[in-house]
Amino acid sequence: AIMSYEVGKRALDFLVENSGTRHNLEVDFFGGEPSLNFGTVEKLVEYARSQEEPHNKKFRYTVTTNGVLLTDEMIDFINKEMYNVVLSIDGRKEVNDRMRVRVDGTGSYDRIIPNFKRLVDKRPKNKDWYVRGTYTKYNLDFSNDVMHLYDLGFDQISVEPVMADPSEPYAITEADLPRIFKEYEILSEKIQKIRDEGKFINF
């Protein structure tokens, strides 16, 4: 079910009422997919802003999105209001589209890359963002996914292991750990090479 404005408003009220003397409050909008309910996100941000002065609070927002439904209007709102943005993509096209399948059976890669590039290109330099991927047993060579994202122009990158029931074919098991440790060594060498060339990458 999609969260209603009323439920979100009660959550914000609860946060304010139980935050004591804390001035800075963090609110994260994430999955499901916030862009499916973006009007509610906009209204909740507006409501939270109205509560800042009366309660001596300051809200900071983060949104996590898979990027499929992002419009220019959403991007402008996100870049204005969201302190941090997490852009979900798993790396190379074949890796991303194996796990992120749309209703019509196609993958999301070709749709989200242009959306993410527009968002990042328009994002103010003083606001945070990063692309965030998940690696599975299917792509234990995930250093290649990190480099693929970097080559696309994304220099703020996080890639983390999937959490899944061991019975799932894509689940990571203890037997995979030596391979994963080796891959992190490979990744660290690739990142160091970029930095040695005087370029920026944050992982």
How would you describe each model-predicted region?
Residues A1-D76, K80-E81:
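Conserved alpha-helical substructure of the radical SAM core
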Residues M99-D110, K117, D121, K125-F203:
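Radical SAM enzyme [4Fe-4S]-AdoMet core and its adjacent flexible, acidic
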Residues N79-V85, G153-Q156:
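Glycine-enriched alpha-helix->loop->beta-strand junction motifs that scaffold or abut catalytic
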Residues L25, F59, Y83, N126-K127, ...:
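A structural micro-motif
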Residues G8, G67, Y109-I112, N139:
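A conditional alpha-helix N-cap/helix-loop micro-motif detector
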Residues G31-L36, G67-D72, N84-T106, T136-K137, ...:
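Conserved radical SAM core fold
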Residues S4, I112-N115:
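Active-site-proximal cofactor/substrate-binding loop regions of enzyme domains
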Residues V27, Y61-V63, V85, W129-V131, ...:
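Hydrophobic/aromatic residues located in beta-strands of well-ordered beta-sheets
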